[in-house]
Amino acid sequence: MTRAVGVGVLVLSLALTGCDGKKDKKRGKHKASSSHSRTAGGGTAGMGSLSAARRAEAILPPLDTMPAALRHVSTELHSRAKAPSVCKDPGGKCKGAVANGRVGYRSGDKAEGAGYDVIVYKNARAAERAFTVWQSYAQNNKHEVTVLQGPPHGDASLMYGYESPSRTNTLTMVIRQDQYIGTLDVRDASGALAARTDMKALSEVYAKRLVQATQDETPSATAAHVKV
């Protein structure tokens, strides 16, 4: 009788140990999974950076810093803690990106417009590589764009126009400043010459905002006094 009871206790003990072992294993697996999820969605871990997204948003000019003629919002000011969702023209510009932002403005009659984009890279070297991709795109796609002589800005800058008849009055300026690349698209239905004049004034202010961001200042440069 004693022997039977002892065997029963031993079997029960082993069974309980086995159950506990499985529970602990599952619990440990679940804990690891939860930890991974937090890391993947964190502000600085993984591919994005919330602090970089906040800097991107600060660089983009708000409505009250725009010229009086461009006080209609065409694209709401926003930023995201990730690379741009569309990585083309040029392809490869998203490599090393940790945040991006965009805003757009237009005139009341829609004849003029200005679109601002900014990409924040993990470091200045990544931004430099991305700018090289932009240069290659502009120089080697002559059927799409034409490199133009533009005002120098930042650590490096590039300006080009478009061959498409629907975009002949649009210019794009690309400005690299430390770990940032800002792009500015200016459109003026009056013609390419008017677009150049607008670009000169607006790009100067945008370049200042990029510089202020690299100096840990709150970007405050304004184009409110500019006539376009």
Question: What is the role of each PLM region?
Answer:
Residues M1-V7:
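Bacterial N-terminal signal peptides that target proteins for export
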Residues A15-G18:
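C-terminal motif of bacterial Sec signal peptides marking the signal peptidase cleavage site
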Residues D20-G104, K200-S203, A207, T214-V228:
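N-terminal "mature-domain start" segment
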Residues H72-V86, R125-T172, K208, A213-K227:
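Short Gly/Thr-rich strand-loop-strand
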Residues V98-R106, N169-Q177:
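Short, surface-exposed beta-strand/loop micro-motifs that present aromatic residues
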Residues A99-F131:
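A short acidic-to-branched-hydrophobic micro-motif
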Residues G115-D117, Q179-D188:
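Short, well-ordered beta-strand elements
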Residues L184-L202:
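A short acidic/glycine-rich loop-to-helix N-cap element
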